[in-house]
């Protein structure tokens, strides 16, 4: 995973620059899955994925196969983060809320950017 990280990062950067959501989605999902595969195959094993996590991942992939730009990544836990375009947020939120086991859907968006703050 680490030996290939720079290559995947470059692919991700190019995908963002070229607005190639499909490639971006594939790379971030692969990277997330690889991180979790390492945890699952370590000794002792750590298994964060829950049935609801897997259902969300399947739902996101199905959406993308039908043409909706959506991708998932997971933190070092069972929390699935869905990345999508702004015009699909409400549709995806509604679908996620229908999944049994989903406790909360938190919407976020791109911020205004970094700002320099003078210390007091």
Predicted feature residues:
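C-terminal nucleotide
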Residues: 1-120
């Amino acid at each position: 995973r680490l030996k290939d990280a720079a290559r995947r990062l470059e692919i991700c950067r190019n995908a963002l620059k070229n607005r190639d959501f499909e490639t971006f989605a594939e790379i971030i999902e692969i990277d997330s899955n690889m991180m979790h595969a390492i945890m699952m195959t370590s000794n002792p094993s750590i298994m964060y994925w829950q049935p609801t996590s897997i259902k969300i991942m399947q739902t996101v992939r199905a959406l993308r196969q039908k043409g909706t730009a959506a991708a998932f990544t997971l933190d070092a836990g069972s929390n699935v983060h869905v990345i999508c375009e702004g015009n699909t947020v409400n549709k995806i939120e509604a679908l996620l809320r229908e999944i049994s086991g989903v406790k909360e859907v938190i919407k976020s968006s791109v911020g205004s950017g970094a700002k320099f703050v003078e210390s007091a």
